[in-house]
Amino acid sequence: MEKNQEFIVTIEDMNEDGAGVGKVDGYIWFVKDAVIGDVVRAKAMKMKKSYGFARLMQVLEPSASRVVPSCPVARQCGGCQLQAMSYEEQLKFKERKVMNNLIRIGKFDEDEIHMLPIMGMEQPWRYRNKAQFPFGKDKDGNVIAGFYAGRTHAIVEAEDCLLGVEENREILDIVKRFMKEMKIEPYDELSHKGLVRHVLIRKGFKTDEIMVCLVINGNKLPGKERLVEMLTGGDGVKGMTSISYSVNQEKTNVIMGKEIVNLYGPGYITDYIGNVKYQISPLSFYQVNPVQTELLYGTALEYAGLTGNEIVWDLYCGIGTISLFLAQKAKKVYGVEIVPQAIEDARRNAEINGIHNAEFFAGKAEEVLPEQFEKNHVHADVIVVDPPRKGCDAVCLDTILKMRPERVVYVSCDSATLARDLRYLADGGYVVERGRCCDMFPGTVHVETAVLLVRNG
């Protein structure tokens, strides 16, 4: 087989990134956009010794699980890997992915782990409360906004995203008209010239409050009063609450700058998860799917088994989303987060909700927890962890084992590191009692999982 040669392959499996997997004469091929059960014609693009990557050219026999993607740019955009798969099959794929990692990486037996059915969405569209659109130009020099094509920084023009809120289209149209009227150029990565880099849009699902923040390659936004007028006036956007710009003059892939200049409104929007109110600024971390977040955190709260007498540690707590949920049922909650801005938000959110039994520490979980345990002899009945994709630090896990809480609730966004860390805790005297996946990101390969571990003896 040579590069650019075409061949026919039956897709028998899918890898963790959502690419179809098939074999030709014992050689493994990964075919993006193919679905289990498809028979496809593919073109060889890149080959290694025992496997290769191929481009989907034609679906010859569609799988029973294949559907027509609802999004017109599904294949070009890097955002959704599973749109060609029925939602029912997406959920099965995610459950299988988690279980496979628990068996393969965690070395658990399948009957050792009681996994409850995945929590899917009734409506797996329009679920994202946050969108970030890069700006650029098309080949004719017109200002465009959209998304980056997979693994590139080439902008795929898209006036809307079916995962985002319907107001996105309206806001993008206004921003493009504003730029044309004020003769403002979009940012160009190669030359580091041009002003508007991105537009950040956030919406409170329970409050209908909307935020717009332009990310600019400069200190000033010309015609800022006109932008406010266009977004808030008679033909503006309903629910517009906060308008600002973020200064980012660095040559970087990081979207937001550190300085936010407020143009209109209080500088934040509010939203609720359950009955807890949150203030969300342009730089705040906040779960992008609030509907499923409520289910996921509800599961974590249930697993914590709180009676009102417990001391709880919430590690990697972000802006305190889980902490404040737990504080309503616990005696005391301690939250730990590495990002100082997030801790400021957490303290403010506790104050807004009249929650006085939550205390927050800014620092690394693997430094704060051992220090509090060894120097101040703090106690924990329950420890909740919600780490980034890389999972928990070994020092952090060792300290959890030394503290010997009755229960550990592990909330994970990466089932590979989840499996690794669960094995570590299981070898240290904990039993994996039950777990449940939650589909926070329909259409994509990502899945969240909550697991309860109970101290053995």
What are these regions (language model features)?
Residues I201, D208-N217, K277-S281, V382:
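Short, aliphatic-rich beta-strand segments
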Residues L116-Q123, E189, H198, R202, ...:
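Short, solvent-exposed loop/turn elements at beta->coil junctions and helix N-caps
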Residues M57-P69, R75-P186, K206, L221:
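Extended interfacial segments that mediate partner engagement and assembly in macromolecular machines
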Residues E2-E6, E16, P222-G457:
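Rossmann-like S-adenosyl-L-methionine
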Residues E12, R126-D138, V143-A149, I201-G204, ...:
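Short beta-strand elements
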Residues G37, G164, N289:
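Short, conserved phosphate/pyrophosphate- and ester-handling motifs at nucleotide-, phospho-/glycolipid
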Residues G20-D25, G146-A149, C213-V215, A346:
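Short, acidic/hydrophobic/Gly-rich beta-strand patch recurrent on exposed beta strands
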Residues M1-V73, D109, E359, E367:
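Terminal RNA-binding accessory module
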